[in-house]
Regions:
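A generic structural motif
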Residues: 18-23, 124-127
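A short acidic, glycine/proline-enriched capping/turn motif at secondary-structure boundaries
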Residues: 21-24, 63-65
């Protein structure tokens, strides 16, 4: 149904691209990403029934939903500034989907993660059919995230997508540069959450 209506042959989900700190700025992440996309295309090309567009997804932190402590702690762990990382993904064609995304809890005693965005790379267009996103997250949540446990949050999000037609895609590197400046300002240190610094929570440049 999804394939026939939207010419979608597959969806992919990138969990991580990991590059050791001493090997950064050598283009390794770009090469790994290109190789992943090339390998996926080659695998899909083996089947005549898998013709059409590929939608690639990845989760990223949403800095505007983070406190200063969360932001800089993650920068320290990742050894890259959060906004620089988002601008990099944006330049690679991965832009955020405009809806309140969250990752369901990874275990029964954990909470859902609500400071994430879901980003997508597609061949063209500024919207993604909600049905494609619904089917992708249904598989991603129940295979990779929830595994052997169930919480109602995943069902609610997947169900909500079933009531939508399309989800808008947004994001520009300039937006992340403005966001980055806010984190390094004295005002941002004293006022949290950061989203309060913007008139519109999803400003794009």
């Amino acid at each position: 149904c999804v394939k026939k209506k939207y010419d979608c042959r597959a969806t992919l989900h990138i969990h991580y691209i990991l590059v050791r700190g001493e090997y950064r700025s050598l283009g390794i992440a770009s090469r790994l990403l290109n190789e992943m996309e090339r390998s996926a295309d080659a695998w899909l090309a083996q089947s005549e029934c898998l013709r059409g567009r590929v939608f690639s997804f990845c989760e990223q932190n949403a800095p505007e939903l983070m406190t200063s402590e969360e932001y800089f702690t993650d920068c320290l762990h990742a050894r890259i500034d959060q906004c620089d990382r988002l601008a990099w993904w944006c330049k690679k064609g991965y832009n955020r989907l405009r809806f309140n995304y969250f990752q369901p809890s990874l275990s029964e005693d954990a909470k859902a993660c609500t400071i994430l965005t879901l980003n997508v790379k597609q061949a063209s267009g500024t919207q993604v059919p909600a049905l494609i996103l619904q089917e992708h997250l249904r598989r991603f949540f129940y295979i990779s995230v929830l595994k052997a446990h169930e919480d109602g949050t995943a069902s609610r999000l997947v169900g909500w997508l079933g009531t939508q037609n399309r989800i808008e895609v947004e994001g520009r590197p300039a937006f992340y540069k403005r966001l980055q400046k806010s984190f390094y300002s004295s005002e941002a240190v004293t006022r949290r959450p950061l989203s309060l610094l913007f008139d519109e929570p999803n400003v794009t440049g």
